[in-house]
């Protein structure tokens, strides 16, 4: 009884409760695929231009292509059509429901609610679960709010928040008993609905999440926001999300994400994007996370065939990294719709898995085939992946570029990483810690920096990469390096490590001399580039460039050197010069190990590998005689025994 009372209290005050989460969103559950759904005939106007038969037909088509989860949107002004009346000189008089009397205190249109229940019934009949985006006030670059609130900032205006809370409570109360609903989403990218400080955004999220939990404490509250930052002062930040919400979401579109759309869509940088960002959000917050919106942004960015190929690699990556669900944006093309935002912007019109007349695109086929492939495996869920290193990020900066750069370098080096906030309550145990692309003059607090270095004293290895004018105190003490001169001057040099040569670009020159450190490699100017220093019982490996933020993926030998210094040895390792292979290792309770190998190259590849163990079986590829063969943008699962 005490536990029930406590959970009720936590739910009532709007703070995220710890505990079990729906398997679609957490590591260890069966992987779900799906999409974001607007009806094929009307898009966002599906509720006002209702066609029940078309909705049934749409959902049948989606279910036939293996989709078991949809994100759906009650368009806010259609469901809560409140209006305002004004008197002399524009003085506000009162609110009305669609210009008439209120039919319920929340001003909710019951005809729209009936249509939403029909959607729920149709989904349940087909085994589809729904993530419901409650405050759908922003969609595809257009604001959609009730007429009475059109000139307000709906994130900060007290009247707007009052009506939002009323709407959410009414909607959740009326639909919470439907079995098709898996989770409540705050809404679609609600941080795009108005300007707000981090504190104001906290208040808004608190109000909406509290309203949800007052009516339904049994389902998780999902973020749905557009980008979450490590930077504590950002509107939507990791600490705020962790405190208030149950499940994190990513919208990993390369076109809109820094350092992503700088390579072809069907290559490694973009193939890793969804898994990398989703793992980052989960690790930063300690909450489950899933890819809620993914997509190519249409045939103007990537052909339909290449989009499908990249999706296939992303699906394998997300599944291998313990991400519970992957949803594409969106179900159907919207190229025949003549209202805004489709009247405004061409890039939003051709994003569907299906054409507007219902023809399946290669992406729909790839989604179906991946889900079918998982069904052929002798296990329903994949054991958690092995993690070798912790990348330590800071709340003093927006760390996305560093996080992504570290992920790509680690993938190419053949190791697996997780993330942690330097200012967090705990620092996970690991043989290797990475302080990537240390920036500015005060990225890590004194306490955070020494907490990492204390791990080196105790026997771990710490990799520090530093460039672009950054200053770290105690550099000489912790790395065995002395700074002779450090000044702003464009600098391009070459480095060779273990026979692999690559270039680095920096905005500054940092001239170093070894003062206890061992120089493992110098750059082409003769300056120490890669060094190692014995520190306590452990080691500090240092590289004199910010390789993570500058998208210098060819510098992966730096990460391999640090992994070797930490004594990390994987069961399957790539041995060749080509590094477009991702490997994750998963130990089962019966002693077997499964290795998921993802080929991020847009062509079939035969990789040279070292295998420590006996290959008992391979699915969707071949692994024999030191060669691993995988199709273009595809994945292979290997079962090993030792």
Regions found by a protein language model. Give the residues of each.
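Glycoside hydrolase catalytic-domain groove-lining segments
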Residues: 199, 214, 218-225, 229-299, ...
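Sec-dependent N-terminal signal peptides
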Residues: 4-12
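Aromatic-Pro/Gly-enriched surface loop or interdomain linker
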Residues: 365-432, 589, 632
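Active-site mouth of glycoside hydrolases
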Residues: 25-245
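Aromatic-rich peripheral "rim/lid" segments of glycoside hydrolase catalytic domains that contact
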Residues: 331-388, 405
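Alpha-helical scaffolding within the catalytic cores
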Residues: 54-58, 166-172, 228-239, 271-281, ...
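A conserved amphipathic helix/loop scaffold
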Residues: 440-642
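Substrate-binding cleft of secreted/luminal carbohydrate-active enzymes
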Residues: 294, 307-345
């Amino acid at each position: 009884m005490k536990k029930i009372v406590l959970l009720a209290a936590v739910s009532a005050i709007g703070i995220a409760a710890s505990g079990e989460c729906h398997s679609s969103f957490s590591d260890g559950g069966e992987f779900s695929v799906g999409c974001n759904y607007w009806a094929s005939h009307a898009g966002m106007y599906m509720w006002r231009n209702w066609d029940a038969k078309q909705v049934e037909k749409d959902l049948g088509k989606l279910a036939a292509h293996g989709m078991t989860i949809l994100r759906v949107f009650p368009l806010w002004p259609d469901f809560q059509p409140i209006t305002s009346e004004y008197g002399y000189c524009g003085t506000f008089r009162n609110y009305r429901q669609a210009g008439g009397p209120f039919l319920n205190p929340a001003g909710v249109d019951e005809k729209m609610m009936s249509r939403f229940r029909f959607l729920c019934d149709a989904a349940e009949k087909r085994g589809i679960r729904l993530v419901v985006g409650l405050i759908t006030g922003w969609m595809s670059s257009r604001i959609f709010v009730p007429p009475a609130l059109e000139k307000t900032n709906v994130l900060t205006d007290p009247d707007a928040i009052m009506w939002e809370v009323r709407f959410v409570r009414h909607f959740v109360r009326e639909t919470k008993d439907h079995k098709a609903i898996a989770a409540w989403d705050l809404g679609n990218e609600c941080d795009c609905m108005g300007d707000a400080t981090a504190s104001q955004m906290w208040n808004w999220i608190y109000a909406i999440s509290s309203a949800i939990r007052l009516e339904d404490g049994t389902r998780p509250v999902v973020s749905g926001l557009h980008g979450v930052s490590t930077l504590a002062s950002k509107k939507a930040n990791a600490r705020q999300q962790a405190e208030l919400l149950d499940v994190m979401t990513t919208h990993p579109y390369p076109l809109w994400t820094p350092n992503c759309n700088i390579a072809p869509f069907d290559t490694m940088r973009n193939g890793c994007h969804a898994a990398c960002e989703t793992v980052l959000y989960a690790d930063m917050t300690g909450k489950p996370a899933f890819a809620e919106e993914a997509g190519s942004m249409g045939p103007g960015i990537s052909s339909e065939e290449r989009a499908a190929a990249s999706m296939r690699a992303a699906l394998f990556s997300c599944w291998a990294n313990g991400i519970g669900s992957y949803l594409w944006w969106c179900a159907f093309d919207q190229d025949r719709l003549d209202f805004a935002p489709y009247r405004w912007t061409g890039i939003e019109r051709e994003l569907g898995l299906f054409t507007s007349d219902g023809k399946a695109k290669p992406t729909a086929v790839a989604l179906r085939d991946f889900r079918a492939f998982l069904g052929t495996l002798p296990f329903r869920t994949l054991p958690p992946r092995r993690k070798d290193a912790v990348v330590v990020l800071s709340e003093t900066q927006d760390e996305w570029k560093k996080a992504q750069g570290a992920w790509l370098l680690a993938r190419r080096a053949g190791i697996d990483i997780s993330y942690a906030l330097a200012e967090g309550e705990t620092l996970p145990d690991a043989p290797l810690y990475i302080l990537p692309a240390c920036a500015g003059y005060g990225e890590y607090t004194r306490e955070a920096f020494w907490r990492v270095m204390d791990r080196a004293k105790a026997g771990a290895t710490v990799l520090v990469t530093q460039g672009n004018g950054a200053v770290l105190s105690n550099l000489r003490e912790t790395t065995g390096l002395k700074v002779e001169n450090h000044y702003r001057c464009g600098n391009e040099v070459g480095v060779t490590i273990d026979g692999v040569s690559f270039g680095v670009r920096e905005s500054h020159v940092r001239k170093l001399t070894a003062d206890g450190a061992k120089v493992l490699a110098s750059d082409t100017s003769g300056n120490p580039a890669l060094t190692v220093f014995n520190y306590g019982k452990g080691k500090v490996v240092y590289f004199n460039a910010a390789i993570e933020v500058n998208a210098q993926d060819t510098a992966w030998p730096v990460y391999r050197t640090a992994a070797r210094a930490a004594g990390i040895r994987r069961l399957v390792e790539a041995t060749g010069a080509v590094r477009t292979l991702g490997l994750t290792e998963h130990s089962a309770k019966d002693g077997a190990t499964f290795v998921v190998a993802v080929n991020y190259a847009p062509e079939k590849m035969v990789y040279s590998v070292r295998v420590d163990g006996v290959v008992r079986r391979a699915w969707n590829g071949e692994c024999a005689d030191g060669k691993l063969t995988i199709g273009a943008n595809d994945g292979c699962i290997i079962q090993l025994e030792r």
